[in-house]
Structure formats: structure tokens, C-alpha cells
């Protein structure tokens, strides 16, 4: 019997139909004679709506009370998913982080996980129940709810995978894995079957939205292999591990610069930086009448800065010229 940790993001459980679809995925995993721990985010834009509601009451709410409020979105998700599983005949129990417990430091709004309790979850698994755990949250030494910041549910899933030595850590998103760039913007993006922790960490730090950089860093530190999948796809997906694919070029992403009209378009790969790649990018952008305002180089990456109005076009241009030149070489 294998242990699966499955995390579903907010867009994957945004409404009743999607929640039931996620429940069917969980059911299939459970009925294949596996133990299953599920981590859920708040549905859709629930967190944003809760945050907006708090601002209507108080411009600068207490961080403690804000954490208590925001954590209710995930609590609702796990309860609803447990109900969905019950209707499918699957025994399931929902837990908030304090019931596990997932212990954190005292930092509200961006807490760090310090330990994960095992006894309660192991008992539920022994009773052959699916254990649904609210993501994005923990509890500090005072018994107060804390939240883990952006990407917190990914962090919850990785921490639980490490604590329980899970055989699989599956991250379900609205895309069918990790791509060489955003497939919703660039038609020539292709899915990566495998990527290294180091390359994924760089892509996340430079703007890729699939996985938060803190969760990738924790997975690397704990040796947790990640599997990124889509709820809508029956196969495929991408693995993130220490080995990676060995490809010299991995992906291209973008990140808007704070307090600036510029956006950084970054290519990541072990062949970077290089004079040839920099020249190819600049020349391709110039052919599209896109001005390059600067270049930044670092270990395994190359960034060109363009005006944010050209962000999507520049992303596709840099992606296509680098991957086409690699294919031709």
C-alpha cells in the first residue's frame, strides 16, 4: 500500500462541479488500495473576498485576526470535499491544521512550518479514511492560527509529504504540468516531463506561477519528488526532482518589476548565460520592434528587461528563438 499526498488548488475546487471532480480523482486513488492525504486551498477567489471584507471593516486589521479569518476558506474546502467523498461512498475526515497539528513559528501572514504531528493522521489512515487537511495554515505555540503566505497550500503538501514519507506528492493545477513557458500565452510551449529542483526554483523566483519557490525549496531540502498534474487531463504531468531532465535549456518566464514599467523575461537552463543566447534574444526582440532596456545574467539564467506593454509578445519571442535555435543545433 502506497501513501499519496494530493494537493488541489483553488481553481481546481472553485465550484461544486469541480469539487466533485476532485473527489472522484481522490476516490480513484483510494480505491487503488492507497492511503490518501489531501491538501486543499480555498475555493476560487475566496481568500481575496475574505481579505476585501476585512478591509471594509478595518483598513489595518490585526494580523492575528486576519489569519483567523483567511484560514476559514481552506476549512470550508476540506469540509465540502469530505462531504463529496461521503456521497461517493469513501470514508473521509477533514482536519484543520491545529488538529493535525501543523506547528509554526509565531509570524502571522508568513509563518514557517517547524513540525508536523503524526499521531492523529496516522490513526485516521489506519482506519482507512481519506484525511483532508486545510492548506495554507498552521498553529503557533500559543494555539493561534497562522497562515503560510502565498503558495501556502503547496508548502503544506510538501511538509506533510516529508513528515509521512509519502510515496507520491501530487500537485493538481489548472494546467497539465510544467511547460517551457505559459501555454496560455505562447502556442509553442511544450510540457516538460521532468525538471530539476534547481531549475524549477529559478523559474518560480523569476515569475512562474505553477509552484511557489518556498515549496520547491522545501521539497529540495526534504527530498520530496513533486508531480504536477491537471484535474482535466487523464495522463501526462511533470516531475520535479534532483535529477531533472538534463536539458541545457528548461524554460522562459516573466516577472513584473516593482514600482516600474518594466518586466523581466527570464530564460532558465544550465547552458545560460551565453553570449549567443543574449544576442539571439536581443536581435529577435528588435525585429519585433521591442526595445530592450537592460540585461541581467546569473548562474543558469538570462533576463532581458522590456516595457510591460510588450510582456506577452516578448515572452513568446524569447521562448521561440531560444527553443528553435536549440532544436536546430
Feature-to-residue mapping (PLM):
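Short gly/pro-enriched beta-turn/loop segments at secondary-structure junctions
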Residues: 164, 221-224, 257-261
Amino acid at each position: 500500500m502506497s501513501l499519496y499526498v494530493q494537493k488541489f488548488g483553488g481553481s481546481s475546487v472553485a465550484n461544486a462541479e469541480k469539487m466533485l471532480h476532485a473527489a472522484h480523482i481522490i476516490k480513484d486513488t483510494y480505491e487503488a488500495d492507497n492511503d490518501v492525504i489531501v491538501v486543499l486551498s480555498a475555493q476560487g477567489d475566496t481568500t481575496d473576498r475574505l481579505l476585501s471584507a476585512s478591509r471594509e471593516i478595518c483598513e489595518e486589521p490585526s494580523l492575528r485576526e486576519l489569519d483567523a479569518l483567511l484560514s476559514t476558506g481552506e476549512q470550508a474546502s476540506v469540509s465540502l470535499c469530505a462531504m463529496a467523498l461521503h456521497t461517493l461512498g469513501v470514508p473521509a475526515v477533514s482536519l484543520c491544521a491545529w488538529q493535525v497539528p501543523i506547528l509554526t513559528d509565531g509570524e502571522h501572514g508568513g509563518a514557517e512550518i517547524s513540525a508536523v504531528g503524526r499521531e492523529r493522521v496516522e490513526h485516521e489512515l489506519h482506519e482507512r479514511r481519506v484525511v483532508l487537511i486545510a492548506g495554507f495554515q498552521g498553529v503557533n505555540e500559543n494555539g493561534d492560527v497562522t497562515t503560510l503566505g502565498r503558495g501556502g497550500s503547496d508548502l503544506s503538501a510538501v511538509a506533510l509529504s516529508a513528515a509521512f514519507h509519502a510515496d507520491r506528492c501530487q500537485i493538481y493545477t489548472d494546467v497539465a504540468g510544467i511547460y517551457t513557458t505559459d501555454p496560455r500565452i505562447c502556442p509553442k510551449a511544450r510540457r516538460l516531463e521532468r525538471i530539476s529542483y534547481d531549475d524549477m526554483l529559478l523559474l518560480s523566483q523569476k515569475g512562474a506561477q505553477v509552484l511557489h519557490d518556498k515549496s520547491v525549496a522545501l521539497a529540495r531540502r526534504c527530498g520530496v519528488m513533486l508531480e504536477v498534474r491537471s484535474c482535466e487531463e487523464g495522463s501526462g504531468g511533470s516531475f520535479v526532482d534532483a535529477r531533472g531532465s538534463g536539458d541545457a535549456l528548461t524554460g522562459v518566464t516573466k516577472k513584473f518589476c516593482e514600482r516600474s514599467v518594466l518586466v523581466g523575461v527570464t530564460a532558465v537552463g544550465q547552458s545560460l548565460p551565453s553570449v549567443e543566447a543574449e544576442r539571439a534574444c536581443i536581435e529577435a526582440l528588435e525585429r519585433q520592434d521591442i526595445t530592450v532596456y537592460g540585461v541581467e545574467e546569473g548562474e543558469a539564467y538570462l533576463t532581458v528587461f522590456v516595457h510591460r506593454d510588450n510582456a506577452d509578445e516578448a515572452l513568446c519571442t524569447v521562448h521561440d528563438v531560444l527553443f528553435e535555435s536549440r532544436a536546430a543545433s
